[in-house]
């Protein structure tokens, strides 16, 4: 029974190893170059920066980006469901409808709370 999950396990192990290698190699070969203050300063096309380059963003930008990611995730679930719609039964159909209903409730809640208003 566990043999059918072997390709998924192998994929996860290989992905983990590649990720760890890609994270570890720069630490092995990088030199400590943070001793120069010029490397830590902001750079704007050869000029001294006019203002602070590390300014804060309004929280609404983060909220809109999170909402975009949530609804982008919805689309990634939507495509496989639409492709396999003729092969799934009513349980698959109503599962997706429940998923869309929960997302719609979340969207309406965010809209009512004023998360999408730019005043």
Swiss-Prot record:
Which superkingdom does the taxonomy of this entry point to?
Eukaryota
Name of encoding gene: ND3
Q: What EC number(s) would the UniProt record show?
A: 7.1.1.2
**What's its top-level EC category?**
translocase
Miscellaneous section? A stretch of 270 kb of the mitochondrial genome is duplicated within the centromere of chromosome 2 resulting in the duplication of the gene. The expression of this duplicated gene (At2g07751) is not demonstrated. It is also probably not RNA edited and therefore differs in all the positions known to be edited.
What is the species listed in this Swiss-Prot or TrEMBL entry?
Arabidopsis thaliana
Annotated Gene3D superfamilies: NADH:ubiquinone/plastoquinone oxidoreductase, chain 3
Gene Ontology MF, one = NADH dehydrogenase (ubiquinone) activity
Q: Where does the record place it?
A: Mitochondrion membrane
Listed A to Z, the keywords are: Electron transport, Membrane, Mitochondrion, NAD, Respiratory chain, Translocase, Transmembrane, Transmembrane helix, Transport, Ubiquinone
Q: Where does the UniProt entry say this protein principally localizes?
A: mitochondrion
Q: What is this protein called?
A: NADH-ubiquinone oxidoreductase chain 3
Q: Which InterPro entries match?
A: NAD(P)H_OxRDtase_bac/plastid, NADH_UbQ/plastoQ_OxRdtase_su3, NDAH_ubi_oxred_su3_sf
**What function does this protein fulfil?**
Core subunit of the mitochondrial membrane respiratory chain NADH dehydrogenase (Complex I) that is believed to belong to the minimal assembly required for catalysis. Complex I functions in the transfer of electrons from NADH to the respiratory chain. The immediate electron acceptor for the enzyme is believed to be ubiquinone.
Membrane-spanning residues: 8-28, 63-83, 88-108
Q: Which reaction does it catalyse?
A: a ubiquinone + NADH + 5 H(+)(in) = a ubiquinol + NAD(+) + 4 H(+)(out)
Topology in the lipid bilayer: Multi-pass membrane protein
């Amino acid at each position: 029974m566990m043999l059918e999950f072997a390709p998924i396990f192998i994929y996860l192990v290989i992905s983990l190893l590649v990720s760890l290698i890609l994270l570890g190699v720069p630490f092995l070969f990088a030199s400590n170059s943070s001793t120069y203050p010029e490397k830590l300063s902001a750079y704007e096309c050869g000029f001294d920066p006019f203002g602070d380059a590390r300014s804060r963003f309004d929280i609404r930008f983060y909220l809109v980006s999170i909402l975009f990611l949530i609804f982008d995730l919805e689309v990634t679930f939507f495509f496989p469901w639409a492709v396999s719609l003729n092969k799934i039964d009513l349980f698959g159909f109503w599962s997706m409808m429940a998923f869309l209903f929960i997302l719609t409730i979340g969207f309406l809640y965010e809209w009512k709370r004023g998360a999408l208003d730019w005043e």
